[in-house]
Amino acid sequence: MAASVKAAHELQSRTRTDDVLISGGVEFSSLLLSKPVLEGLSASGFQRPSPIQLKAIPLGRCGLDLIVQAKSGTGKTCVFTTIALDSLILENATTQVLVLAPTREIAVQIHAVVMAIGSAMEGLECHVFIGGRPISQDKQHLKKCHIAIGSPGRIKQLIEMGALMVSSIRLFVLDEADKLLEDDSSSSFQEQINWIYSSLPANKQMLALSATYPESLAQQLSRYMREPTFVRLNPTDPGLLGLKQYYKIVPSHSLPHKVFEEKVQSLLELFSKIPFNQALVFSNLHTRAQHLADILSSKGLPAVCISGGLSQDQRLEAMWKLKQYQCRVLISTDLTSRGIDAEKVNLVINLDVPQDWETYMHRIGRAGRFGTLGVAVTYCCHGEEENKMMAIAQKCSLDLMHLPDPIPPGIMEEACDHDVIIETLSKPKIPDNFKPEKKKKAKSEQMKSKPSRESHISVVITESVTGDKSCSRAETKTKNHSPKPGRQKQMAPAANLQHDSTITQKQQNNTLPKIPPLSSFKSHTGKRMTFDDALVDYETFIREGPGRSVEIIHQYDGFYRSQDKVNGLHDAHDEDEASESYVLEESQSHQDLPPAQEVSELSSEQKTSSESSSESEMEVESESSSSVPSKSTLEALPDNKVSLVRNHSELAKSTLPSTRVPQQATRSKQKPCQPQSQDTAHHHNLPHKHRTASKSSRRPTGPKRRTRETDETEEEEAGQDYWSSYRAWAEYYNSYYHHSPYNWMTAFYMNSVYIKEMMKH
């Protein structure tokens, strides 16, 4: 038999309202349940059924499809758990009950209730199937599982894989049915529910439970159920009787973080004025929830954050801390607004107004569980949030009150499990009257007024006049002992009080909480880093940083040096071309001429050819000087400027007219040294204008005609060189300025990432 676990609330320990109590001595034994189920109910703390349990359990045991609506915290989980356990056939190892929940936390909580009530049932197997856990573990659990509880996504996956056999399922339960069946495009629950429902046997019983019953839920459930029976208590008044609801208007601002700061200040003031056991703070944004948890922890208030962005283990750990009273404040999104049962939570704060009235009712239902007393406070800005809050109050007929300022001390009617003493101090430091003897006196008086309580915790919350709230809590658990007789008489005289208060400074320091010095929280700065060391560290971070595996293809060492490294080979090659252009041209012209003509021309026109060659050499040199700077000019420039000039000249030469491109390609394939006798061989391969120029230079013509043709040729080539250089420069700068913003943004982003990583250390 499984160990019994307390799953019910103790009715005698706290005040209960009428919406969870029934008149008369009705007990669970009058509901005709099986003996193991009754034993499990008694062992887990269930003494008498609530009104919703009294009406719904008998109808469910008759096999009817039920739609159950009741207020938050009135025992709906116990309804379908009791019906499911009482209908099980333990000898059959197949899955007989399937329970779906909208969140993993609710599924885990349902599993705990089932195991607590079914603790007296020998051989009961109940398992949870949720995301974040290995599939192999789920397959192992499904070999013998009477009750399967899980989220729709994982259950659908197991059915598709064939691991979960649904042919023997006789009871299908939808907990928080309005959330599972809501018509929302952002939620895929409805599609998954339809798929799961279609795979189940036709002859089955179905239960749908929720604290809210919107109109859309009735339309959705009509598709699944056969003549369902409605079990609804106080449908026109969904609010809890023991819960006081307040709202507070905070100044609106155009910047969201300013509004958040205003709400946080009001929240800290509320925590310092209202004594509470545990509190739930709801935020619409994940980032704000985590930020608020950090702020409260820095103020000394134990706070834990839970959201959908955390891992499954972190989420379960946060819920365990809340239920085991390991944290005072839980900051959450709407992940825990439904179904979560924490008995000691008596304060709920909405940092943001919820999106709809259903979410609001579920949020405030986390306080005032099973008829207890509690307080709910909602912060809203002027304008849209205020109008939305008023619409919710009108829709649900809520008794919504404005939070008084200043907050009165008696706003929390129920006494807390630990006593909270609020003291106003003149200085932020710890006062002299903070003595252990006075705390013992306060404890003795409280134990005298409440002798039935075995243990309690004393918390001292101090508030400074200057507005800085500091909470110094000294939590001390006292064993069950009564003060000695005559003890209070000895403490009454003032002289004895002064004598007892004379405690050394060392003893007083020992009673205070041990907080590390401020220097231990600071990162010790080492020696100063030079720029070269910082550069090496930055490159190491880019290559070998956390989560990085970078292969360096090109290293940027500055604009001019980078251009030299990348294009250094091309620069040298182009310089060789410029210096050998004339030699290649002459050698190719000699190769193309016949031998006889070559000899005759060399004998008759040797002087003329030498003159024309000198003129063509001057022309080629002038052309090369227009695109390639002279050696003296390059020597005069700095090293970092030389590469830039060379690159610009290369770019200008690459855009020369098409008539010169084949010539350069041919020259690059030739050897640099050719015999001078082959100069005329290139004559037939030259373009038309070059042939004309060469022929006219060898003919005996007048000086005027030769001068005119030379001037026209030089003028034409100069114009072509000018426009080609102009286009080259324009294209270069267009491409450069087009990509420069992206290069700057990339560099800025990488530097910002590097700085952030350095700040962490």
From Swiss-Prot:
Cellular component terms (Gene Ontology) = cytosol; nucleus; SMN complex; SMN-Sm protein complex
- List the SUPFAM superfamilies: P-loop containing nucleoside triphosphate hydrolases
Every Helicase ATP-binding domain range = 57-231
Q: Annotated motif Q motif: location in the chain?
A: 26-54
Q: Where is the composition biased (Low complexity)?
A: 600-613, 623-635
The EC class name is hydrolase
Show the ranges annotated as biased composition (Basic residues).
Answer: 683-707
Q: Which GO biological process entries does UniProt record here?
A: spliceosomal snRNP assembly
User: What are the subcellular locations of this protein?
Assistant: Cytoplasm; Nucleus
Q: Where does ATP bind?
A: 48, 53, 70-78
* Substrates-to-products reaction catalysed: ATP + H2O = ADP + phosphate + H(+); a ribonucleoside 5'-triphosphate + H2O = a ribonucleoside 5'-diphosphate + phosphate + H(+)
Please give the Gene3D superfamilies that the UniProt record associates with this protein: P-loop containing nucleotide triphosphate hydrolases
Basic and acidic residues bias locations: 443-456
Q: What UniProt keywords apply to this chain's record, in alphabetical order?
A: ATP-binding, Cytoplasm, DNA-binding, Helicase, Hydrolase, mRNA processing, mRNA splicing, Nucleotide-binding, Nucleus
- Specify the Helicase C-terminal domain's residue ranges: 266-415
What EC identifiers does the entry list? 3.6.1.15, 3.6.4.13
Any one GO MF annotation of this record: ATP binding
Short sequence motif named DEAD box, residue ranges: 175-178
State the residue spans of region: Disordered.
428-525, 570-720
Query: Polar residues composition bias: which ranges?
Result: 498-512, 655-679
**Lineage: superkingdom:** Eukaryota
Give the similarity note.
Belongs to the DEAD box helicase family. DDX20 subfamily.
Task performed by this protein = The SMN complex catalyzes the assembly of small nuclear ribonucleoproteins (snRNPs), the building blocks of the spliceosome, and thereby plays an important role in the splicing of cellular pre-mRNAs. Most spliceosomal snRNPs contain a common set of Sm proteins SNRPB, SNRPD1, SNRPD2, SNRPD3, SNRPE, SNRPF and SNRPG that assemble in a heptameric protein ring on the Sm site of the small nuclear RNA to form the core snRNP (Sm core).
Per UniProt, subunit arrangement is:
Part of the core SMN complex.
This chain belongs to the protein called Probable ATP-dependent RNA helicase DDX20
- Give the species: Danio rerio
Lineage here is: Eukaryota, Metazoa, Chordata, Craniata, Vertebrata
